[in-house]
Amino acid sequence: MNKDMCVACDDGILNIRVGAIIMKDGKILMVGNERANYLYSVGGRIKFGETAEEAIVREVFEETGVKMEIDRLGFVHENYFYGDDPSNLGKLIYEISFFFYMKVPSDFAPINESFTEDNSKEHLKWVSLDASIKMYPEFFRAELKNQTDTVKHFLKDER
């Protein structure tokens, strides 16, 4: 099996991932877990040898139980931050993410729970873009309210 695109670099980590934008009735499908006090997009790391498109289709299926098609690439996000997970606590992480709008089937009924690579339980949650809940990426709130066909690039640097 191919390894995740997560590479140790000097004192930090390079992480290449994909995220899904799954919208229905003005809400976005997000993921939470037992350890985090925030929500994040459906998605995960690209595996070596996989394209970003292949990765998002696989990740959406793993987390929702539904095979979905890609609509279009929406955002590229570069993010420098310090890890908060026990495996990367305090390490500088440079994460490059590709966020894809997905074609949501009319009968879309995702599973409610999945598991992370370390067997932590994850849960799916439909969230209004106006909800005052902490979610990442932070630009989703504003950008998804005013969608365009243009691919946008964002940089967040917490160094």
In which residue ranges do the predicted regions lie?
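Acidic, metal-coordinating catalytic segment for phosphate/diphosphate chemistry
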Residues: 1-19, 25, 89-90
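A generic structural micro-feature
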Residues: 12-14, 88-96, 116-121
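A structural signal for short, well-ordered beta-strand segments
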Residues: 20, 73, 98-102
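Conserved hydrophobic "DFG−1" position in protein kinase catalytic cores
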Residues: 22-23, 30, 102, 126
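Conserved Nudix-box catalytic region and its N-terminal flanking loop in Nudix hydrolases
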Residues: 24-63
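A short coil-to-beta-strand element that immediately follows conserved catalytic motifs
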Residues: 67-76
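Active-site-adjacent beta-strand/loop module that shapes the phosphate/pyrophosphate-binding cleft
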Residues: 81-111
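NUDIX/MutT-family hydrolases
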Residues: 101, 113-146
